[in-house]
Curated annotation (Swiss-Prot):
The lineage of its organism: Bacteria, Pseudomonadati, Chlamydiota, Chlamydiia, Chlamydiales. SUPFAM superfamilies: Nucleic acid-binding proteins (SSF50249). This is Single-stranded DNA-binding protein. Residues 1-100 form the SSB domain. InterPro entries: NA-bd_OB-fold, Primosome_PriB/ssb, ssDNA-bd. Keywords: DNA-binding.
Length: 160
């Protein structure tokens, strides 16, 4: 059995249906962007939500919503309209979250900077030693500094 996490945007509003055995299933079409060489491509996944899971989220799931799903992965084979064999990635959803990078009804979601501007905060990036950094300082900062070096920790450093 394969399990995976996928982040993308809904290509359509959720579809609700009942199986022949009377089980309720909500189907989401999730577009996940991938990069092949220098070209961006979109892989479409069929995400099935079984029973009454995530019912409170359903009114907010619309075409263009950014979501993150996790669940069991399978491949479904079918015949296309022109008669050629096709396959589709199917995810049986165990976890569903709204993406912090999602869009609301075709527009982008408010970002952290937008929220800070609304309440009068100034957005500041903080460096490794707690110093404030501007955009130029961030470019000059070596993100791998200290990688591979042994670190000394005390009990207060460990969160558990």
């Amino acid at each position: 059995m394969m399990f995976g996490h996928f982040a993308g945007y809904l290509g359509a509003d959720p579809e609700e249906r009942m199986t022949s055995k009377g089980k309720r299933v909500i189907t989401l079409r999730l577009g996940v962007k991938t990069r092949v060489g220098m070209k961006d491509e979109t892989v479409w996944c069929k995400c099935n939500i079984w029973h009454n899971r995530y019912d409170k989220m359903l009114p907010y799931l619309k075409k263009g919503s950014g979501v993150i799903v996790a669940g069991d992965i399978s491949v479904e084979s079918y015949m296309s309209k022109d008669g050629s064999p096709q396959s589709s990635l199917v995810i049986s959803v165990d976890s569903l979250k709204f993406s912090p990078f999602g869009r609301n009804e075709g527009s982008r979601s408010p970002s952290l900077e937008d929220n800070h501007q609304q309440v009068g905060y100034e957005s500041v990036s903080v460096g490794f030693e707690g110093e404030a950094l501007d955009a130029e300082a961030i470019k000059d900062k070596d993100m791998y500094a200290g990688y591979g070096q042994e670190q000394q920790y005390v009990c207060e450093d460990v969160p558990f």
